[in-house]
Amino acid sequence: DDFESLYPDIFRSSNITRCKLQMMRTSPQPERWRLGPTVAAGLTLRHYDSFRNCKSLSAYSNRIAKESPEFDQWGIHVLASQNGAGEILIGDSHEYDWQPSIFDQPIIDKLILNYLKSFLVVPCLEITQRWHGVYAKLPRQSEFVAYPDTEVTIVNGVGGAGMTTAFGLAEETFNQ
């Protein structure tokens, strides 16, 4: 939002949109139960570009589009990870819109949980918290970079891979 306010012309020409995602968190799992590494399943293969060379991805994507179009409608793929308190974080969905709704869609949470149950058994799936986030997304590009002034560099739109790429991109930008 600062980018949009401070440099509206550059922002409008950037093609950045917004992505809203819905997430959930369970109550803590029984004491010694641990999930281990983050768990993902087939829908996640369709979401991240890292998997685009997977030979069966096209056939799988076509099957999902035909049999479960609601996953595409809401941009759903499912990840589950456990925090130090034993809670399972579950998500997420992807609604691309310049003005995403402030209201969450209960059907999205239901679809995510039903899909999660199809490949993961968790002792306690009692959902104690639900939230959504909104981030900047640059379709078909990894980041937007502009230099509106000699002392200003704008880097934005890394949403979707920001937690993975942000530190490397920051280092690259500062070293220029």
Report each predicted region and the residues it spans.
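Flavin-dependent oxidoreductases
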Residues: 1-81
